[in-house]
Amino acid sequence: MNNRVHQGHLARKRFGQNFLNDQFVIDSIVSAINPQKGQAMVEIGPGLAALTEPVGERLDQLTVIELDRDLAARLQTHPFLGPKLTIYQQDAMTFNFGELAEKMGQPLRVFGNLPYNISTPLMFHLFSYTDAIADMHFMLQKEVVNRLVAGPNSKAYGRLSVMAQYYCNVIPVLEVPPSAFTPPPKVDSAVVRLVPHATMPYPVKDVRVLSRITTEAFNQRRKTIRNSLGNLFSVEVLTGMGIDPAMRAENISVAQYCQMANYLAENAPLQES
């Protein structure tokens, strides 16, 4: 038996498809999402509707974004979901969530079992729309969830941790074994809740500067910041901000990265491209 076939659909490797089929896990995720009628619920990658059906049962209207044309067609003809669905057959990586929130007249509640092969770049795409998003619930590779929630001085702490926590409050919800999927992935999974900050705890003047600093620091994470960020900050400037130049990228808190970004935005602003 081909374990890549589920409910008559062949899982496409290039789309990173692993279909959720464990009812206890599904119920736990829907309970965590807690969808309510009248909310602007948006699912990324509904697949074979494992989450779409129980969420859709509670709603009058649900928006889904599905790249796979066969799966989008199945949803369109779904016996009870079909009339409730607004289906966008396109890539979530290029989707304009801001326009959708404007169209729906309220911030979006986004959820999904994300394809693991695009989960990190998709998170960064979504972060650029946090003004238009109320909250997000995602099934991700457990290692990615660990990176999202990691604090300084840990191996998992990296650029994704800093940027996620700059934009959102990040809360792990539950862990999910490979056996909950068809075909089973080779990794453990986990569900995470991300709630964009109503008020930024560490406001930055130019988020592009924060992105640049974290990229440069974590691309050379074994180097001290005296070396990895030496082209941006002198030892005197770092010391003046109370940041030890002998620290490495993983030792610096989100607040300190934001402090560094604001210094740079004021003293060496990026030119508009």
From Swiss-Prot:
<dbReference type="Pfam" id="PF00398">
    <property type="entry name" value="RrnaAD"/>
</dbReference>
<comment type="function">
    <text>Specifically dimethylates two adjacent adenosines (A1518 and A1519) in the loop of a conserved hairpin near the 3'-end of 16S rRNA in the 30S particle. May play a critical role in biogenesis of 30S subunits.</text>
</comment>
<feature type="binding site">
    <location>
        <position position="20"/>
    </location>
    <ligand>
        <name>S-adenosyl-L-methionine</name>
    </ligand>
</feature>
<feature type="binding site">
    <location>
        <position position="66"/>
    </location>
    <ligand>
        <name>S-adenosyl-L-methionine</name>
    </ligand>
</feature>
<dbReference type="InterPro" id="IPR020598">
    <property type="entry name" value="rRNA_Ade_methylase_Trfase_N"/>
</dbReference>
<keyword id="KW-0808">Transferase</keyword>
<dbReference type="InterPro" id="IPR001737">
    <property type="entry name" value="KsgA/Erm"/>
</dbReference>
<keyword id="KW-0963">Cytoplasm</keyword>
<feature type="binding site">
    <location>
        <position position="91"/>
    </location>
    <ligand>
        <name>S-adenosyl-L-methionine</name>
    </ligand>
</feature>
<dbReference type="GO" id="GO:0005829">
    <property type="term" value="C:cytosol"/>
</dbReference>
<dbReference type="GO" id="GO:0003723">
    <property type="term" value="F:RNA binding"/>
</dbReference>
<keyword id="KW-0694">RNA-binding</keyword>
<dbReference type="InterPro" id="IPR011530">
    <property type="entry name" value="rRNA_adenine_dimethylase"/>
</dbReference>
<dbReference type="GO" id="GO:0052908">
    <property type="term" value="F:16S rRNA (adenine(1518)-N(6)/adenine(1519)-N(6))-dimethyltransferase activity"/>
</dbReference>
<feature type="binding site">
    <location>
        <position position="18"/>
    </location>
    <ligand>
        <name>S-adenosyl-L-methionine</name>
    </ligand>
</feature>
<protein>
    <recommendedName>
        <fullName>Ribosomal RNA small subunit methyltransferase A</fullName>
        <ecNumber>2.1.1.182</ecNumber>
    </recommendedName>
</protein>
<keyword id="KW-0489">Methyltransferase</keyword>
<dbReference type="InterPro" id="IPR029063">
    <property type="entry name" value="SAM-dependent_MTases_sf"/>
</dbReference>
<feature type="binding site">
    <location>
        <position position="45"/>
    </location>
    <ligand>
        <name>S-adenosyl-L-methionine</name>
    </ligand>
</feature>
<dbReference type="InterPro" id="IPR020596">
    <property type="entry name" value="rRNA_Ade_Mease_Trfase_CS"/>
</dbReference>
<comment type="similarity">
    <text>Belongs to the class I-like SAM-binding methyltransferase superfamily. rRNA adenine N(6)-methyltransferase family. RsmA subfamily.</text>
</comment>
<keyword id="KW-0698">rRNA processing</keyword>
<dbReference type="InterPro" id="IPR023165">
    <property type="entry name" value="rRNA_Ade_diMease-like_C"/>
</dbReference>
<feature type="binding site">
    <location>
        <position position="113"/>
    </location>
    <ligand>
        <name>S-adenosyl-L-methionine</name>
    </ligand>
</feature>
<keyword id="KW-0949">S-adenosyl-L-methionine</keyword>
